[in-house]
Amino acid sequence: MDDDNGLELSLGLSLGGSSGKAKARDAPLEPKAEPQVEESSSKGGLQTPDAPSGKFYQKSADNHEQNSKQRHSPVAPQFGNFWGQPGNSSGPVVDGSVEPVSHQPQLSSYQDGRMPINSGNNSEEQKPVSGNHKLPSEEMNFQKKHQTASDQPDAFSKSSDGGAKNAPISISTDDGSTGENEDVAESEAEGSNSWLVAQREDSAKGSVVNKGSDRKRSADAAADGFKGKRQPSFSGSESSSGKLTPGNLISMQASNVVALPYQVPGQVSGPPVLTNAPNFHPVCTVQLRPPTNGGLAVQTMGSASQVAFGYPAVQLPTLETGSSWAFGAPPQALSSFTAKDKADQTGTKQVDDGKKPQEAGASSSAHAEDEKKADRGLSLMGSAIRPGIAPNVKFGGSGSYPDLPWVSTIGAGPNGRTISGVTYKFGRNEVKIVCACHGTHMSPEEFMRHASADAPAQDNSATLPAFPAGNQATSAEN
């Protein structure tokens, strides 16, 4: 009877049966055989020597189980003395082989973790043929498993009985060294993970570098703009409306240049008209340089150290130096000597009317002021009346009053003489003179006729007091 591998089962059974019977007869003679047989029967589940051993499949399963036990425990005793005869080579010999079955080479370590213990379907394929060759089924299974493990490291491999089982990555070879598939699989797994991590890190670094470069670029732009090295760039709409782009600073080009944060015209056509303040005169105009950098008008600081305030240049008032109250002094009503014939030519002027209190120690300054007032009045009256007192006037009584606004005139004709008088303001535009010879109040024209007509009478009354009316000085002060 032959199986698939060409083994003669009848020869094996006959050998096994004859050897079993022979060993059973010799068993009582050797006391050492009993513990070995018991040990072997307890470990391998074999029958006693008296029991018939006619089934070869049971022996093959026992041999496979014993081989697996020897792989897990290398110190376990071999079954060289399986039948209790240590001296003889008593082992089941298969197909004329000299070496017993127990001394045949074990299966390679690739079966660890893959070949189940209770594999009865493939027991005939696992039966040893010779001591130096592997079974064809074992080689085929090894190749299939090697290819499956190398192609799909994480796939599930099937065991010999058809059950699904998770196959590990590492593959053991005949010499006990681990194959390269484990390193390759681990390197691929680590490489894929490290590649993803590297991509994320590179993207994160790139974003951080971009942000840092943008911040540095904006900081450099701000620093350059503050130092005046870089000019801000404006678009067309922003330059026309005067809006600045965010992040740009207004550059100061020179020490005497101030940047304005709004759009102003390059030239100021004329002084502004202020409707709310009719007495408020406009100020000096602001000098503007033509727009150079994107329509930005820049004010230049002149020698007068003009300062640009926070509002447009057209609203900057100018200081009128000729104004009486421009330097903090309140306006005053000033008295003046006016004449009707000169009023339409020079206009109305306000002068001091002399209401300030006179001091005794300041007579010289008051006299000079009176002379100025007389000059203003004489310019209106003509050159016939001059300020001052005539040298031939004689004063009696309380004496002369040098602080009064004295005037003198010379009469025309053969009878003309020099007379003096004191002027005072009679009306708004009228001045009268009190003559010193008679004390008569008269107008400037009458005063001039009095100097021409009354010359003889004036000579006769030389001893008359110069001021017959003593209240003329008081009236003049009022």
UniProtKB/Swiss-Prot annotation:
Main location, first listed in the record: nucleus
Keyword Plastid on entry: no
Compositional bias (Polar residues): 169-179
Signal peptide: none
Top-rank taxon: Eukaryota
Chain spans, region Disordered: 1-247, 337-374, 454-478
Biased composition (Basic and acidic residues): 23-35, 339-358
Gene Ontology cellular-component annotations: nucleus
Compartments, as annotated in UniProt: Nucleus
Annotated Low complexity bias: 233-242
InterPro entries: Ninja_fam (IPR031307), Ninja_motif (IPR012463), TDBD (IPR032308)
UniProt keyword Glycoprotein present: no
One protein family per Pfam: TDBD
Swiss-Prot/TrEMBL keywords: Nucleus
Comp. bias intervals (Acidic residues): 180-189
Any one biological process term the GO annotation gives: jasmonic acid mediated signaling pathway
Entry's family note: Belongs to the Ninja family.
PANTHER family registered for this protein in UniProt: AFP HOMOLOG 2
Protein name from the UniProt record: Ninja-family protein 8
Organism expressing this protein natively: Zea mays (Maize)
